[in-house]
Amino acid sequence: MDREYKSSLRCLKIGDKVAELPIIQGGMGVGVSRSSLAGAVAAEGGVGVISTAQIGYDEAGFEKDQAGCNLKAIRKHIWMAREIAKGKGLVGVNIMVALKHYKEHVKEAVECGADVIISGAGLPMNLPELVPEFCRTKIAPIVSSKRAANLILKMWAHRYNRTADLIVVEGPEAGGHLGFSRDQLAHRDEMDFDQEIRDIIACKKEYEEKFGREIPVVVAGGIFDRKDIDHAMALGADGVQIASRFVATKECDADERYKQAYVNARKEDVQIIQSPVGMPGRALCNPFMKLVENGRIPVKKCYNCLEKCNQGQVPYCITKALIDAVEGDVENGLMFCGANVGRIDKITSVHELMRELAEG
């Protein structure tokens, strides 16, 4: 690879695909990780990930046809990310199981030749059904426990005679939607998540033997620097997924005010919220979240984003809240973040961040 910095980190192999650096940039929606960020990460030899959640929010006609605009934007941003990457790294997509048009997003990503589909916010039980085994696109579930990992691997093997190409193990320090109860998150310091990672690595070995292939494990949630990467690798992981740090980069697709809110954030500004998705999430405390705590914000328009959403009962419209934030209204929008956002102190470039992580 023609970058000027070297790294002792080994490459990440996902089947027949190889990322020179074992660093996946986590998918962030709405609109936070699209082609600009994902393409820049791939250009550095990592895995750039586009979030498909309401990805077409700024396409003409979105107010009337969210589904069509999102599919159009998936095509556009995968193509644009590849143009930026110039053949380096890998370009993947993150598709939430909770999305109303989950199947359509998966099929569009496959048709567009995404290198990998990473799927969470629910368990992607039918993902192998939607992704042909011999196409170029790899499939990766996000899990937060050995129980979830075993459930998916067992189900995929039994129902589809398939297994995961990659497993993302997301811990309790992650941002966005979390695969833990509020009680678990409140007592996360008592949790031995390192052991959970080891258990998942042990669990997947049965399926590696059964299918005659390696299933790399990538650790996510609270990964901030090279020390964290080395720790994950020492546990037996093959790579890491990092999201929040990539928000504070010039290439991130969010508004500059969104990025600056990350830089300005303190540890005490982070809170656990209840998302309309039905899962706990981690986000920045702001006037919007205080309004939500005092009572629901009536939903004036439905954007048809979630499979299970009762417009008359949800505490607020998650689509509107996320779009407001990514467009720069950081006081009145929802800003997901990881537990370590308070450690971010500047906006840098993807190149410099990847160099820092790679060189240590």
Language model regions located:
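Residue-level detector of alpha-helix initiation sites
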Residues: 32, 223-224
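Conserved active-site-proximal phosphate/metal-binding subdomains
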Residues: 24, 174-218, 224-360
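Active-site entrance/lid segments in N-terminal catalytic domains of soluble metabolic enzymes
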Residues: 1-210
